Amino acid sequence: MSRIDDTFARLSETGGKAFVAYMMGCDPDFDTSLQIMRGLPGAGVDIIELGMPFTDPMADGATIQAAGQRALAAGGSVSRVLDMVRAFRRDDDATPIVLMGYYNPIYARQGGVDRFITEAVEAGVDGLIVVDLPPEEDAELCLPAREAGLNFIRLATPTTDDRRLPAVVRNTSGFVYYVSVTGITGGPAANAAEVAPEVARIRAAAKLPVVVGFGISTPEAAQAVAGVADGCVVGSAIVKLIGEGRPVPEILSFVADLAQGAHSA
């Protein structure tokens, strides 16, 4: 089993919920980003989602787009994000890490997909979320990644109907990421009552944990959404504090409050 599988198995034994925190790799710079990343497990984060900066992030709202631009300006890249993972793994071999991003910087990188998968596994990455690669293109990255031992996590949305859902979950592993609202990150607040039946539908089709993201920015929202799912993701609210240049302890304190909300569901 992967670290992701182990995490959900451990949580399910006690009825616990997973708290997943997203941050952009190399934002605002490599050292600060690594310092924040290293502090996440101690703040209660169960799974870390680490963004790979890209020039044209179509699914991201203004907050995460700005984070990507800051990271790129600081020399951030897929290679540097993998360096972050390697550095993190020197001190933490338990916390799952999921890289989240877009296909172009993976494909266009020297050595392409094969080199990326090899280096990701060697660095200690556990899973991938590639938001612009549909199931019809599974042979490009999803299947080779899974063969190498990586979980490949897909997004389901409010517009993923029962005809589309089987294709979405067919080669998904680790968990399914349910996008609670239609649109980009940092949008309107998630509604737990609306999310609950969708989570049940996806869980039944995928036979996997379902984690809900988008529209969660407070401990109360984390508690409400995690209560109807297997966990929740917070990204933009954390990235916003990083963008404001808040001290690392303040950022981690905010993350700890969010994690406590999710874990109290």
From Swiss-Prot:
EC number(s) per entry: 4.2.1.20
| Active site per database record | E49 (proton acceptor), D60 (proton acceptor)
Report which residue ranges the record marks as coiled coil. Answer: none
Cross-referenced CDD domains:
Tryptophan_synthase_alpha
Q: Which InterPro entries match?
A: Aldolase_TIM (IPR013785), RibuloseP-bd_barrel (IPR011060), Trp_synthase_alpha_AS (IPR018204), Trp_synthase_suA (IPR002028)
Tell me the Pfam families matching this sequence: Trp_syntA
Gene3D superfamilies, sorted: Aldolase class I (3.20.20.70)
- Name a GO CC annotation attached to this entry: cytosol
Pathway listed for it is: Amino-acid biosynthesis; L-tryptophan biosynthesis; L-tryptophan from chorismate: step 5/5
Q: How does it assemble?
A: Tetramer of two alpha and two beta chains.
Query: Hey, which family's this protein in?
Result: Belongs to the TrpA family.
Query: What PANTHER family does the record point to?
Result: TRYPTOPHAN SYNTHASE ALPHA CHAIN, CHLOROPLASTIC, TRYPTOPHAN SYNTHASE, ALPHA CHAIN
The cross-references to HAMAP family, in alphabetical order and at most eight, read: Trp_synth_alpha
This chain's protein is named Tryptophan synthase alpha chain
What organism does the record attribute this protein to? Paracoccus denitrificans (strain Pd 1222)
Lineage of this protein's species?
Bacteria, Pseudomonadati, Pseudomonadota, Alphaproteobacteria, Rhodobacterales
Gene name on record? trpA
